[in-house]
Amino acid sequence: MKVRTNTPQLQQLRRDIFELILAEHPYNCLTCAKNLRCELQAIAAYIGLEKISLPPIHRQFPVSEDNPFFRRDYNLCILCGRCVRACQELRGIRAIAFIGRSSETMVGTAFNRSLADSGCKFCLACVEVCPTAALIDSVPFWRTNQSKEAYVVPCRHACPAGIDIPRYVRFVSQGEPGKAVAVIREKVPFPGVLGRVCIHPCEEECRRAQLNEAISIRALKRFAADHDDGTWKQNSRMAAPTGKSVAIVGSGPAGLTAAYYLAKLGHRVTVWEALPQPGGMMRVGIPAYRLPREVLDREIAEIVSVGVEIKLNHKVESLEWLWKQGCHAIFLALGAHRGIRLGIQGEESPGVIDCVTLLRHVSLGEEVTLGQRVAVIGGGNAAIDAARTALRLGAKEVTIVYRRSRAEMPASPEETEEALREGVNIFFLTAPNRISHQRNRLQLECIKMELAEPDASGRRRPVPINGSEFTLEFDSVIAAIGQQPEIPAQFQLRTTRANTIEVDPATLSTCIQGVYAGGDAVSGPASVIEAIAAGRKAALSIDRYLGGSGNIEEELVPKEKPDPWLGRDEGFAYWKRVAMPSLPPKERISSFCEVELGLNREQAAFEAQRCLQCHLRLQITPLTLPVGSSPG
């Protein structure tokens, strides 16, 4: 028996039926957001429909924008039922269904409730399967400059190191922190450090924030690291020795990350560190109340365990000397350890210190005396760290002087809030004019500022208000307006106007063959995660330079196919972010004990279960259209 599926009669029947569908569809293709991406256009081209003879039927269904993620225009709906099946059968949420009767039939929620009240989890499977623009992203990805993956899973795309955030969050939600930390360690050797001090750009992009509050991704990373069972080591691999040697200058996050991956690739790696303890700015720039030293020491020990040698108290002054040690490549991860001067009269007075020096002295256990009243000049994270450190050193009154408003303050909002809770005062729109030393006290003359048009940084430029000068008295003044690298002239490297090392951004190679540079020495003061990303890139480039493949990727936990079934959870849209438990302010300022205490298992699981699991949308296989049906 032969079954014919493309006879002239069947072709005409398809056109007739398709005309019935299009009769109720608005004729606004040219202005539709899905123009040239609409399946109706593709089918019309495939079946050869050239005109519509039936009179149009104008439906007057409402257009709903009751959520921040997508738009619902049921005038464009063809009642194919894909979205309903995706919600009910693929996800198990049952937030939408067919409602109404006859010509009033449409897709909606029970009792016309909002999506949030109907149990929707905003996974956007419905949007992915919709053939028209009836359900469409508020801003379709093709109207952005992003790839679909970056648009759909912005948290993963925002991570400089490329950590698979949805995957490890899912493992935490399932009560498997060992697998979660394995996923994190596939990209970084410092999960515990990042779980405490990462600037979390992923959270800034988290789509859940558009609903209520972002997932506490950093806290979940810390939970996974704190519950590391070490099983990831079973899948960790070491390459055979290559006979090549790499010298790394600086044991900060960039240097140690590069060292870790290069050692695993079989190279002999020696890290040269000028300080008496390893860790760079992780040790001497971040106070212990934010990053306990035992956490840092434990993760550095893992790096040493793969064969990395760290030589302390060795300040490298010459590249020529390094070459003579027998290395085949050099990576400069010098950090940014020099504080920037205030540029005002009197800053050389006794009692004035830059925050980089202060934090280094405190971190290395050296004696520091600040007195009872301390001023901190600046508005970044270093200024906040210096102010909170001053409290812990016994200061009774700590005042931050910042020339812009709080809205322009570059410091982390949560760190600023914690400083205020601890009793730090902040004078906004205030700038220092000069410092004088009188009667064993520092007189800090300040002037009030107002904000004008934005400057090159994008922030509104502060300008002084004439006649608004006033004077404050302090025992110490801490300058915290920035820091920069110290690049020895003997290195003979090309540098920028900001005194950072000039490199090829694609490879991090310098003007000298075989010499690479990264981290704060190249970017200027940045974050731990950005430095780690630079260390990864350097390891890749150096391995290729030494004849390797440059493949530093690892699979520490076997890949699995995520379960598309989400199930129904009443009130999901309203689940609030779990607050990080912490020491009371009065208790914390008496020591350098860690302030944040970490989530327990129940808190971590609940917080992880708040995830929208945006990545599941990418698991839906794109529709394969018939040959010759592309509307474009």
Task: List each model region and its residues.
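Conserved hydrophobic helix-helix packing surfaces used for dimerization/oligomerization
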Residues: 246-248, 269, 374, 398, ...
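Glycine-rich Rossmann-fold phosphate-binding loop(s) that bind the pyrophosphate
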Residues: 249-254, 379-380, 520
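Feature captures the FAD/FMN-dependent oxidoreductase FAD-binding
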Residues: 179, 240, 245-249, 297-344, ...
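Glycine-rich dinucleotide-binding loop and its adjacent helix/turn
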Residues: 223-240, 298-315, 339-393, 496-511
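Mid-to-C-terminal Rossmann-like scaffold of FAD/NAD(P)H-dependent oxidoreductases
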Residues: 147, 151-155, 417-423, 431-438, ...
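Rossmann-like dinucleotide-binding cores of NAD(P)H-dependent redox enzymes
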Residues: 268-271, 275-311, 362, 387-434, ...
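FAD-site-proximal beta/loop scaffold in flavoenzymes
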Residues: 348-372, 454-525, 529-533, 540, ...
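Fe-S ferredoxin-like electron-transfer domains
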Residues: 1-270, 274-275, 282-289, 300, ...
